[in-house]
Design a protein with these regions (language model features):
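Catalytic domains of cell-wall/extracellular-matrix polysaccharide-remodeling enzymes
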Residues: 35, 43-104, 109, 115-121, ...
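Catalytic grooves of carbohydrate-active enzymes
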Residues: 52, 126-153
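Conserved, mostly hydrophobic/aromatic
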Residues: 59, 139, 176
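Histidine/acidic-residue-rich catalytic or RNA/ligand-binding cores of hydrolases
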Residues: 99-101, 117-120, 147-158, 197
Length: 199
């Protein structure tokens, strides 16, 4: 996938073929990425979302965890403040850094549904909900119907379908109610960020 900023302006983020470096190329990216180019690409992506009529809630690095470098993390927090967004931090050092700035961050390790076994996934989700510790937790779930078209293009369709099956089940609804779990999205976190100084 290519960048949204002009390739010539973000060359330190690109492979030899002009594509954005992938998560498995993270070590090289962290060595060569120029901070000004990271900023250009982040701005281009946020602006593209806004130009599409969508309202972003947060900035994150997707598969790159918390940006991989302190300067990239700090840039991301500054951009989030400028755009009125939250920052999604996965790892404890970054979460601690946000809390030290008076900004909300999740309290527990992140759960990614792609890392759960498909066999017994519903039971695993149920146990995780029953054992959920107090505080703010983040689960990255990827629900989708897994229809014929998605099966042809998405090798992860089974993960998505099993997420959908559990999340829309009466069991999930009952567990959320009985365990008194409040489900929020990043809009709630974004609102908390905008009400705090954080600098």
């Amino acid at each position: 996938m290519g960048p949204l900023a002009a390739k010539a302006k973000v060359s330190s983020l690109l492979s030899e073929t002009g594509e954005l470096l992938t998560p498995d190329q993270l070590p090289g990216l962290l060595v060569q990425a120029r901070l000004d180019e990271v900023e250009l690409e982040f701005r281009a992506q946020v602006n593209a979302v806004a130009d599409a009529g969508l309202t972003p809630t947060h900035l994150d690095w997707h598969c790159l965890a918390d940006g991989g470098r302190d300067d990239i993390f700090d840039l991301t927090v500054a951009l989030a403040r400028e755009y009125g967004l939250a920052v999604r931090a996965w790892l404890e050092p970054a979460r601690r850094k946000l809390r030290q700035r008076g900004l909300p961050a999740v309290d527990h390790d992140f759960l990614d549904s792609f890392r759960l076994d498909l066999d017994g996934k519903s039971g695993r989700y149920a146990k995780l909900l029953r054992d959920l510790p107090g505080g703010l937790s983040e689960w990255a779930v990827h629900p989708a119907l897994g229809d014929e078209q998605s099966q042809m293009i998405d090798p992860g369709w089974r993960v998505r379908r099993t997420d959908y099956d559990f999340l829309t089940s009466p069991q999930a609804r009952a567990l959320l109610e009985s365990e008194r779990i409040v489900v929020i999205d990043y809009r709630t976190i974004q609102q908390a960020w905008s009400g705090r100084p954080g600098r």
